[in-house]
Amino acid sequence: MITVGLLGCGNIGHIIAKHQKSFTITAVYDQIEARADDLAAASDAHAYTDFTTFLSADFDIVVEAASITAAQEYGEAILRSGRDFVVMSVGALSDTVFRENLVQTAKEMGKKIYVPSGAVMGLDNIKVGQISTINTFLLRTTKSPASLSIKADSPTMIFSGKAHECIRDYPKNVNVSEALTLAAGHEVDVELWVDPDTDRNIHEIFIEGEFGDAYIRVRNIPSPDNPATSYLAALSILTLLENLDNPLVIGT
């Protein structure tokens, strides 16, 4: 059974801890001791607040469920410790220099960097963009105005541009666009909308190319314990972990 070191003890960490089947959490790390202790107790794991000591513990893979900053700060050390690395905060990889250095380190160490599908679906087949022509590639995200701390009386587009521009202007809304860009090998165009009549995050993907065309719409249910977290994003990590040692590989 795969053993997991969990980096970050927030809402997603607790969801992972509640659904251990084909994996076991043996160590958890958080800078806040109470959070680490709480999750450790829930998962029968050891708690750490010192990262170096955490890395000395016995586990096979590290799952980052903390933040972009944490992924960038600890990613290289995790790979150099001989562990594969699951990056939930995929927005960390929007930094080209960081991403290239991290990939090079993974190659040197013979390790893998895993990016879960997160809050969207269809990420596997979007990878056809790496080997075929993509003509149109658009992500339209719609959120409630309150989630972005703005006011709007009707559906309003507040951003239209390339993914890297959206990351600059709306850094808390980068994970989906970066996951799509990495999957396709092609930067996605982004529209960000607010709609006072929606209480969920909606992601619509429009893609057309050599393969044909597709439209994907995901209306996310918030995590039961944290409305700011997509429940689908948490489930995507669980799916990844459950299938790591499955001899039957499904999907591209």
PLM feature spans:
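Glycine-rich adenosine-cofactor-binding loop
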Residues: T3-I16
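A short helix->loop->beta-strand "cap" motif at the edges of active sites that frequently abuts
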Residues: A45, S81-D84, E108-K111
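Active-site-lining helix/loop region of Rossmann-like oxidoreductase modules
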Residues: I113-Y114, A119-T252
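Short, hydrophobic beta-strand segments that form beta-sheet elements in well-ordered domains
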Residues: L6, T26-D30, V62
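Rossmann-fold NAD(P)-binding glycine/threonine-rich loop
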Residues: V90-G110
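NAD(P)-binding Rossmann-fold cofactor-contacting core
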Residues: F23-A40
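General beta-strand structural signal in soluble alpha/beta enzymes
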Residues: E64, V87, I113-S117
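Beta-loop-alpha module in the N-terminal Rossmann-like domain of NAD(P)-dependent dehydrogenases
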Residues: T49-R80, A92-T96
